[in-house]
């Protein structure tokens, strides 16, 4: 696992966007796994700026979804499919034909979960998976004590998560779905490169547990320690609880530019 400490969210976004740009240069049809939420927005903005300037050609890129609400119509403005269309696909100049995700409206939800795992494998696997992290160490909707070998499956949202997400539904918690489909930790670990971005002091404990704690289901993100190519990008605030912060800064400062992340 590589830990990169940056000054702020913008710097983290630019660093990760550059890694994605380099990947697309090597493999134009790369399958990029993307996440929703506010944390990855600086990544998408930086990558879209490179595409707009002509520095990056993303026309053949493919986009894979990390999770989706169950029972929310695909065209609903707050379905994660719609959110990713607005925040990722359209800014990169991609249509929905470049997108793949689980069917949250399927009658057979378990079948839809299994079908998505198979679709990811059939597509050649995810080349680079973006991740955020919760204050409790969750990735995707894999909450603490999720199996580290879990596959794409249905999960029940906690009441607190529904309360938090109500702001996207006009403040009405009754509109927030009770369930989601999420890639499992085992599914996530199959991506060739995992890149986790965490910003803000509120994520400091989770980052410390992920990077320096034991691999344990109580902190799902700690599973990244098992991956051969995992990069954790954190700002100074999110790195504030890392005992080895100085070491991480030193090793990254001495890294040759050509190596990337």
UniProtKB/Swiss-Prot annotation:
Annotated signal sequence range: none
Residues annotated as the enzyme's active site: 67, 136, 138, 143
GO cellular component term of the entry, any: cytoplasm
GO MF annotations in UniProt: glucosamine-6-phosphate deaminase activity; identical protein binding
Top-tier EC class: hydrolase
Catalyses which reaction(s): alpha-D-glucosamine 6-phosphate + H2O = beta-D-fructose 6-phosphate + NH4(+)
UniProt key word Hydrolase: yes
Keyword terms: Carbohydrate metabolism, Hydrolase
EC number(s) from the headed UniProt entry: 3.5.99.6
Domain of life of the source: Bacteria
GO biological process, any: carbohydrate metabolic process
Record-linked CDD domains: GlcN6P_deaminase
Pathway per the UniProt entry: Amino-sugar metabolism; N-acetylneuraminate degradation; D-fructose 6-phosphate from N-acetylneuraminate: step 5/5
Role played: Catalyzes the reversible isomerization-deamination of glucosamine 6-phosphate (GlcN6P) to form fructose 6-phosphate (Fru6P) and ammonium ion.
Annotated NCBIfam families: nagB (TIGR00502), PRK00443.1-4 (NF001684)
Family according to the record: Belongs to the glucosamine/galactosamine-6-phosphate isomerase family. NagB subfamily.
HAMAP family, alphabetized: GlcN6P_deamin
Name by which UniProt lists this protein: Glucosamine-6-phosphate deaminase
Source species: Streptomyces avermitilis (strain ATCC 31267 / DSM 46492 / JCM 5070 / NBRC 14893 / NCIMB 12804 / NRRL 8165 / MA-4680)
The organism's taxonomic lineage, starting at the top: Bacteria, Bacillati, Actinomycetota, Actinomycetes, Kitasatosporales
Annotated gene: nagB
């Amino acid at each position: 696992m590589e830990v990169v400490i940056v000054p702020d969210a913008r710097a983290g976004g630019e660093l990760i966007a550059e890694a994605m740009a380099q990947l697309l240069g090597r493999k134009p049809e790369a399958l990029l796994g993307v996440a929703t939420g506010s944390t990855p927005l600086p990544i998408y903005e930086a990558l879209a700026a490179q595409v707009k300037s002509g520095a990056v050609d993303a026309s053949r890129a493919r986009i894979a979804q990390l999770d989706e609400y169950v029972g929310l119509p695909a065209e609903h403005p707050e379905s994660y499919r719609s959110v990713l269309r607005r925040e990722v696909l359209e800014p990169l100049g991609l249509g929905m034909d470049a997108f793949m995700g689980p069917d949250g409206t399927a009658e057979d939800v378990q079948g839809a979960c299994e079908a998505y795992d198979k679709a990811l494998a059939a597509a050649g696997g995810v080349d680079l998976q973006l991740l955020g992290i919760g204050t409790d160490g969750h990735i995707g909707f894999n909450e603490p004590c999720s199996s580290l070998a879990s596959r794409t499956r249905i999960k029940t949202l906690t009441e607190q998560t529904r309360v938090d997400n109500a702001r996207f539904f006009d403040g009405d918690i009754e509109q927030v779905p009770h369930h989601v489909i999420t890639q499992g930790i085992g599914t996530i670990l199959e991506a060739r490169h995992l890149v986790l971005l965490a910003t803000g002091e509120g994520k400091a404990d989770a980052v410390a547990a992920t990077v320096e704690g034991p691999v344990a289901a109580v902190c799902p993100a700690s599973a990244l320690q098992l991956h051969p190519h995992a990069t954790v990008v954190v700002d100074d605030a999110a790195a504030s609880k890392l005992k080895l912060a100085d070491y991480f800064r030193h090793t990254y400062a001495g890294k040759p530019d050509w190596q990337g992340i």
